[in-house]
Structure formats: C-alpha cells, structure tokens
Amino acid sequence: MNCSKFFILCFSFLFSFAQAQNLALTKKKNLNTRIELGFDRGIQLSKNFPILKSGEQFNLSISKLYGSHFEAGIGVGYQNLGDEQFMPIYLLLVGKTKAGSGPYIESSVGYAYGENSKYEHAVISNFEGGKYFSTGIGYEFNIKNQYSFLASCNYIRQQSQVKHYEGETVNYIENLTFDLIVFKIGLLLK
C-alpha cells in the first residue's frame, strides 16, 4: 500500500501546486479544491455472509464551477477498512441549490485500486479493486469568499474481486461488494 500512499501524496502536492498557481486567477477560472475526511460504517457482501466494516477515508478533489449551481471535477482518495484498503480515482459532480452557504448533492463514479492484507502474500489468490460509486447530500458553510466548511453524509458502493488460481488459470472468482454510509467533514478552497 506504500505505492498508494505515495500516489496520494504526489496528487496532494499537484493539487496544492495547481491551487497556488491559480490563486490570482481563481475568480476567472472558478477552481475549487476539496479536502475531506470521512468515517465509514457498513457491510461487506459476499456469497458466504455479510461482514460488518468500519474505517476511515481521505478524499482530495479539484473541480471547476460552471455557473453558480454546478461543478464537475476529478478526485482521488484513500479508504481504510481494516484488512482492505482502496484508492479510488473518480469523476465528481456537485449540484448546489444556491451560491454560497447552502445544501448540495454530490455524486462520484470511478475505479478503486484495492489491496487486502490477508491476500498480500498469497500465491493462489489475488485481491483486486473494482468499480466505485458514491452519492450523498451535504451542507456548505461559507466562511469567507475563499473558504467553506463542508459536512455531508454519503452512500458508497465499492466492488472488488478475489481471484482464486489453480496453477496459472483462474479457478474461481469471488465478487465482493462493500456498502457503506460515510460521514464526511471537509474544507473547500475556492
């Protein structure tokens, strides 16, 4: 997972650099940077039985404001669910009811790379990430024209697979689904 943490760190520096370079042009380009921390709770569904999961996540995204009610962008995150760690890369869509402070809805779709500590050194099994989807509602508290505090509640559906090998061929694929409720807080840099 060190590679994933390194990628997130590099992505963070890229966003910070992009935000710093565009500080004077922010009004013209309407670029927003979101930094969010979340607490996850949910279940992992497999063919055997559901498993209760808890964890935390960190998301970093950059988006462009189109008008005063819609923004679209890209993001990356890190999600730790104990044995499983995911690194989603996603497209972010946000709809606002009004400019400034107020409620918003958000949706993310993408792919998450995954690792599982149980399968890290396994020879006959391999854990892989999969499709990532998130949707939720939140409230933006405008602090100044340059900053906002964010609070949201989201539903996340994360898919993954465990491939079991016999020799070099895949003998069995176990599809896993993680259904999570996430409470996030964050900072929006405008």
Locate each region found by the language model.
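Outer-membrane beta-barrel porins/channels
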Residues: S148, Q161-K163
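Outer-membrane beta-barrel and related beta-rich outer-membrane complex signature
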Residues: Y119, K163-Y165
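Gram-negative (and chloroplast) outer-membrane scaffold detector with strong preference
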Residues: R41, E56-F149, L189-K190
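Outer-membrane beta-barrel domain signature
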Residues: A24-T26, L45-I51, N80-E84, A122-F127, ...
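Transmembrane beta-strand segments of Gram-negative outer membrane beta-barrel proteins
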Residues: L25-I43
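Cleavable N-terminal export/targeting peptides
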Residues: M1-N30
